[in-house]
């Protein structure tokens, strides 16, 4: 079977289940299976092996149940870098990239030592380290599997000597002085979680979404602990 035929089969299968991005998803999944870029996939026509056809159909089946593409291919782009993700890490959002530029602008001529609370995949922390070559950071998360994923990304981006990842509550690192704290904490109101799209509420880690009854549980806990936070830079 040719690549174009397989893309059409995958797209039609997803379309019947009302997956809006059916064509794009089919292309992304096949390019992942064939270990090629989507661009190269679309400009060439090749025969697909039986083994890869089986693998492709298996991944399409996962998408039929609304599993996010990022978890299916274990990859999500953030700030032009591909980050490893699975069900233990919140999928990086494009809008989160908006955090990076102001930090880069404020600290580009300084040596920055910062803390990332709820480091997840490491996309925020590692993007800061990538943009600010004189920076160092500590990332904390309470989930061992999440920290494991972050370590995969840390090694891939070759910034191991400037980063430390710890599996512990953030309060336990407040004995250090940081120039900056960054965090993308859970902020969804508990009663609203069931209203989220299926790909989010069924697959992404609840502890990274659930902000408690008012959506501010972690945020209030953080600000309560900030009494011991010092060494803030003046702007």
Predicted feature descriptions by range:
Residues 103, 128, 200, 222-226:
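Class I S-adenosylmethionine-dependent transferase superfamily signal
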Residues 159, 204, 230-232:
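Helix-to-beta-strand junctions that scaffold the AdoMet/dcAdoMet cofactor pocket
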Residues 32-106:
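Conserved AdoMet
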Residues 187-218:
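Mobile active-site "lid"/loop adjacent to the S-adenosyl-L-methionine
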Residues 213-235:
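Conserved Class I SAM-dependent methyltransferase catalytic core
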Residues 1-56:
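A short N-terminal interaction module
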Residues 14, 154, 226:
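Conserved hydrophobic residues forming the short capping helix/wall of the S-adenosyl-L-methionine
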Residues 95-195:
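Conserved SAM/SAH cofactor-binding pocket of Class I
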């Amino acid at each position: 079977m040719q690549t174009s035929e397989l893309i059409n089969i995958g797209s039609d299968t997803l379309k019947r289940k009302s997956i809006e991005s059916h064509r794009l998803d089919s292309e992304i999944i096949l390019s992942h299976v064939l270990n090629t870029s989507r661009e190269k996939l679309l400009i060439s026509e090749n025969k697909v092996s039986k083994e890869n056809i089986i693998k492709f159909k298996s991944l399409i089946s996962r998408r039929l149940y609304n599993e996010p593409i990022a978890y299916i291919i274990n990859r999500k782009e953030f700030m032009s870098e591909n980050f490893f993700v699975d069900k233990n890490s919140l999928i990086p959002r494009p809008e989160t990239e908006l955090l990076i530029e102001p930090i880069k602008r404020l600290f580009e001529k300084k040596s920055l030592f910062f803390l990332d609370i709820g480091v997840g995949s490491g996309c925020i922390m590692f993007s800061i380290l990538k943009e600010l070559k004189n920076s160092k950071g500590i990332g904390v998360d309470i989930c061992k599997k999440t920290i494991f994923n972050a370590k995969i990304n840390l090694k891939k981006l070759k910034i191991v000597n400037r980063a430390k990842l710890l599996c512990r509550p953030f309060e336990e690192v407040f004995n250090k002085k940081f120039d900056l704290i960054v965090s993308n904490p859970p902020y969804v109101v508990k009663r609203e979680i069931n209203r989220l799209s299926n790909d989010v509420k069924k697959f992404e880690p609840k502890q990274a979404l659930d902000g408690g009854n008012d959506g501010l549980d972690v945020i209030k806990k953080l600000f309560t602990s900030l009494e011991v936070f010092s060494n803030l830079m003046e702007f």
